[in-house]
From Swiss-Prot:
ATP binds at G53, H54, S55, G56, A57, G58, K59, S60. InterPro entries: AAA+_ATPase, ABC_transporter-like_ATP-bd, ABC_transporter-like_CS, MetN_ABC, MetN_ABC_transporter-like, P-loop_NTPase. One of its GO terms (cellular component) is plasma membrane. It is a peripheral membrane protein. It comes from Cutibacterium acnes (strain DSM 16379 / KPA171202). Part of the ABC transporter complex MetNIQ involved in methionine import. Responsible for energy coupling to the transport system. Its EC number is 7.4.2.11. This is Methionine import ATP-binding protein MetN. It holds the Pfam family ABC_tran. Belongs to the ABC transporter superfamily. Methionine importer (TC 3.A.1.24) family.
Length: 365
């Protein structure tokens, strides 16, 4: 048995996980609850994909469909091209062994050492003792906890406990890692450390990472692809840069407002206009700080004057994103030319996919 730290080989479908028109309903005493409604979503192999939504959006149900703990009421969930719901109990075991998972509350065995916590899935998989020891040593080194091998969980910080959880989840060399609200119980600094480790898992081991969260800061820090759930509906999906630059749904816009200033509302716009009575105000969304800077340099040659009166910038996975309001003044022709330059910047990112969300009749899980 090989003991290198990389995940086991698997059929190389470009889309690692696919939801095809998936609806999931639960029967309750009060009636039928629709947790997911006609969700179609593809997660690419080797990516870091985030699924974000508020409580009740259907995130937990989506995770349980991936590892076969739930089956769709309608539609299909494919992992490596295989319909999960069609697998027998025997065929389900290797699929679940190929999917690691970490949780908000760590789920460690308090009475066992860190070494034995990481060893647990290897013992279930009947690894040879020598291979088991080598694998655990590799993993504890990878997550930076070699010196903690014989400690118990109550001797560790929250961030260290989550590192143990990651090591244990990677023990059997899965090709998929599901992180279900894995940083919700951590402080911001520790969250950043754990997210950095998840990036390494993806970059160095080639593992497809699926992050389930309600925190847009987590999405901003780590995600390459973003999908937004609202009351069981997929309301938006696209690259992180696309979703952040051009949010299509109201849900996404509210999430983004928690980490980056949005364009001014009507009242703020009126105030800015009163402060700049002779200027034309233009809202700009830029997916790269240099493109906005280049635009301002071009405007300086038009004869128009400009001033940034509102906005800010954040870093996302593959670049930066800024929302700005620019006050333009000067000769009418120069101002018009400057407006066109700024519009080119705002139109430079492709729109995300989105859908109109019908009013749900039941609350999703």
């Amino acid at each position: 048995m090989s003991t290198d730290i990389t995940p086991s080989s698997a059929p190389q479908c470009p889309d690692h996980i696919v939801f095809e028109h998936v609806t999931k309903e639960f029967r309750t005493r009060s009636g039928t609850v629709r947790a997911l409604d006609d969700v179609s979503l593809a997660i690419k192999r080797g990516s870091i994909s985030a699924v974000i939504g508020h409580s009740g959006a259907g995130k937990s149900t989506l995770v349980r469909l991936i590892n076969g703990l739930e089956t769709p009421t309608r539609g299909r969930v494919l992992v490596d091209g295989t319909d999960v719901s069609q697998l027998s109990d025997k065929a389900m075991r290797p699929l679940r062994a190929d999917i690691g998972m970490i949780f908000q509350q760590f789920n460690l065995f308090g009475s066992r050492t860190i070494y034995d916590n990481v060893a647990y899935p290897l013992k279930l998989a009947h690894w040879k003792k020598a291979d088991e020891k080598k694998r655990i040593t590799e993993l504890l080194s990878f997550v930076g906890l070699t010196s903690k091998a014989w400690d118990h969980p109550d001797q560790l910080s929250g961030g260290q406990k989550q590192r143990v959880g990651i090591a244990r989840a990677l023990a059997t060399k899965p090709s998929i890692l599901l992180a279900d609200e894995s940083t919700s119980a951590l402080d911001p600094e520790t969250t950043a450390d754990v997210l950095s480790l998840l990036k390494r898992v993806n970059a160095e081991l080639g593992v497809t990472v699926v992050v389930i969260t309600h925190e847009m800061e987590v999405v901003r820090s780590i995600a390459q692809q973003v999908s937004v759930l609202a009351a069981g509906h997929l309301v938006e999906s696209g690259s992180a840069r696309q979703v952040f630059a051009h949010p299509q749904s109201e849900t996404t816009q509210r999430f983004l407002a928690t980490i980056i200033g949005q364009h001014p509302n009507g009242e703020e716009q009126a105030r800015l206009q009163s402060e700049n009575p002779h200027a034309r105000l233009v809202d700009v969304s830029s997916v790269a700080s240099h493109s906005f800077g280049d635009a301002l340099a071009r405007i300086s040659h038009t004869g128009a004057s400009f001033q940034i009166v509102h906005g800010g910038v954040i870093e996302v996975h593959d670049g930066s994103l800024g929302n700005y309001t620019v006050a333009l003044s000067g000769p009418a022709q120069a101002v018009e030319q400057a407006v066109q330059i700024l519009e080119e910047v705002s139109n430079s990112a492709a729109p995300t996919t989105s859908a109109t969300v019908p009013t749900p009749t039941e609350e999703a899980h």
